[in-house]
Amino acid sequence: MQSTLNQLLTFIPLAFWFSYSTADGHGEADSNAYVLHSEYEIATGQDPATLSAELVEYQKNQEAYGFNNCGVYQHQFGTQRGFYTFCYFNDFDQLDAILKKSAASAAGPQSFADHSDNILEVQQRNLTISPEYIAYMRWDFDASLTLAERQQRADKLFDMFNTGFGGCNLYHHAWGGEMAHYMACGYTDYSDFGK
């Protein structure tokens, strides 16, 4: 029997920006084949606005290190975690250069309770602009399924959500112990979400 764990999270954007500067070698030719996806949990008693400001500044630094574009969303419903960040990159050579450049910077004190990082492969991209809100989903399929069967199920779910939302991205876990698929679907407001 197939069991599927789905987490549906809704986010509001804090900041979003694109870095398409030809001076740093990035431009419309960027493939953005991968994304560094991170989730941050707000510490007990912490002011979310403080962490929000820190993450926006952190994402700006990530772009300065060489990521193609980065952004921050704040969780609104569905989980204890407080913020979702992402930074796109083309390949692991670019990621290696970014990590070497960022290693020299000093890390400040940790102001969040917990966080997780995942490197995801972009499988399908239909979100062409930063949506006002996103519904973020993670799908873990039963371990008895083959990789091809998991992908078939993810593709079916993606087709359904992409049709319903009018634009979604599909990702697959590219590094680490998870065998999950992820989706981000955009909408303009809750009236749009309800349709």
Task: List the predicted regions and their residue ranges.
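Short S/T/G/P-rich N-terminal loop/turn motif that feeds into the first structured element of a domain
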Residues: W17-K195
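Bacterial N-terminal signal peptides that target proteins for export
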Residues: M1-T10
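Bacterial N-terminal signal peptides
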Residues: L9-W17
